[in-house]
Amino acid sequence: ECELYNWDPITYQANDDYTDYHNYDSYYLVKPSYAMDSVDTYVEKVNGYGSKNIGMEDIGNTLAGDYNPKDRVSREAALNLQVKKLQSLKQGGNKVMITSGNQYAVPYADFVTDMNLDARAVNIIDEQVPFYTMALHGLINYSGGAINLADDEKENILKSAESGAGLYFTYIAEKTSVLQDGKYTRYYACNYDDWKKDTLSLYNKFNETFEGTYDKAIDKHEKIAEGVYKTTFEGGKAVVVNYNYSNYQYNGQEIAARDFAAVKGGEE
């Protein structure tokens, strides 16, 4: 196994101050063979409880080789090991959820969480087209990052609506005060009781807006005004997302500021 840290981009040294400040732990890369054996142990335990739902944090997300000269494994070989393991899980009747969704793993997944829905972190990009989600929609269920852990909760919700993504939350049962002064304060907004009402309301809104679309392809994605985007699904149903801080009129239908709504398909 190999222990890794966050690194200072200037000094190229392990940045303990950054790690402490951002509450990040060091983490480990393990031998690919050990990782696959660990999956078997995990799946056996889960199946033992009568469940066939398997969630993966690293398989399908993190890809690393093993460069020990006594037992060298290339990244390509590690990829093949992951694919074979995912194939085995599907053949065993399991439903598989993966994180992020590397292309080689997506065909074997039933749900992908933490998919990157937004490229605007790159300042030179003026506009973006959601090619990846357009290609996958109707074939696999996916979501962006956890709504309640987002830097901008509303932006996350709007981007999920524009991309035809599902909703994803991270919860804990304990009061978040138990995390104070610990390594996991990034989960400060995860108490289930605090989010239960808002979660139910948001799920109901998504279910009503996107009813009948999750198994349909995205036929068209277009910018219809500054800060306003329209996604049209197979069959004609469309959703307009308004990122602006003022209301928008679409064919006589008012789309509230920082909100989204289902509209009739067709031209504006």
Annotate each PLM feature.
Residues 2-268:
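Active-site-proximal substrate-binding groove within the catalytic cores of carbohydrate-active enzymes
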